[in-house]
Amino acid sequence: MRQRFTARAVVVGDRAGTVVPDAVVDVRDGVIEWVGPSSEAPEQGDADVVALPGVLTPGLVNAHSHAPMVLFRGQGEGLPLDRWLQEVMWPREARLTPEDVEVAMTAASAEMLGNGITTSVEMYFHPERIAAAVGVTGARAVIATPLLPLPGMPPMEEQLRTAVALAIGAPDDGSVEYGLGPHAAYTVPLPVLRDAAAAAREHGLLLHLHVAETATEGDDLLAAHGLSVPSLLAAHDVLGGRVLAAHCVHMDDGDLDLWQEYDVAVAHCPASNAKLASGVIRLRDMLDRGIRVGLGTDGPASNDSLDLLADQRLAAGMARLRERSATALTAAEAFWLATGAAADAIGRPDLGVLEAGRRADLVHVDTRDLVFEPVGDLADLLAHLVWSADGRHVRDVWVGGAQVVRDGASTRVDAGALRADVAARAARLATG
């Protein structure tokens, strides 16, 4: 199937912030064939034409999420991370059923698609139910099966064996990919972390874990082992291969040197870090060292939205405040962190940028709104996309060339029915 998308402009999703005016994107069988100005476009031929009045962008890539936690949105308000987990989240999660997770993920996936997020890295229970949910909504997911020693869960060694078997047995079609998700060095025994990392390297899987999210985490592990969190992971052979570390807030120069040495990627979650008062990462230092970074929402219970367009604005603002410099993160870099950089961080070079050979995950942002005025040059469009727009301005979304959002609504699921179902399940989980 051939498709031709025409738009006011295309925002490519590269680090340079390339914007192509009066643009064409040609797609064949779900893969981009050509991108450029309409004046240089190849012959249209028999392509189905989709004419769009706004801006076309890559599908956003959410580098860290626990999306089924829409069941717990807003709960535990005002608590720091340790109390938030122990007093509010984990007791509710102990009552979760597989069906709860699938319904919640379906609702959350539809919400993310409506905000322009076409791919998310998920770490949550019942990974096969998460896969089933995105199969319904039409999204993509990289699912890091959680490894965590919680009551009622199998022994850690059994969890790891099951997670590896699930990952290596999954179809390689680009829609759902499984990885390994040992929660963190403060919750998972170090030998299990080491074994999970070895398995991930052996099979080419994503290893996804939380690192240095809070000062308390770092202080406790330093007291117990005499090492920072990154140094502890390096000492136990956890680094190397395809590692994606979420948060990475409390990192000194030596820690950043390790990340650079082992090519560890970072999932930066500014909204969650701000809400839970975890801290502000050294984003400029990471980028200047060549450390791969992608934006993540974290879970909707600690963000509390699933809107990367809003989070890119927060990431830019926090970086500028930290460095006291209005150039600490440019608009082009902020958008790149949610697109091309995020795809690179999660190890998916087939996503995140509008260029030939990548999958046709496309987002139409309606620019017929006051927040997109004035436009003196192409840089203004990108600046408005970062500093003024949010998920409300997403009108249409395609994943692999298939439309999954039309005029702001899912083409696959009934959002109203899902909302009611999530509300009922959340009430049950809150009361036991």
What is each residue range found by the language model?
Residues A215-L227, D255-Q260, A277-M286, N303-R320, ...:
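Histidine/acidic-residue-rich catalytic or RNA/ligand-binding cores of hydrolases
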Residues R8, V25, G30, P53, ...:
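Divalent metal-coordination and catalytic microenvironments
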Residues L71-V103, T137-G152, E157, V164, ...:
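Active-site gating loops and adjacent loop-to-helix segments of metal-dependent hydrolytic enzymes
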Residues R129-V249, G254:
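Metal-coordinating catalytic core of metallo-dependent amide/deamination hydrolases
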Residues M1-A23, R28-D29, A338-G432:
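Active-site microenvironment of metallo-dependent hydrolases
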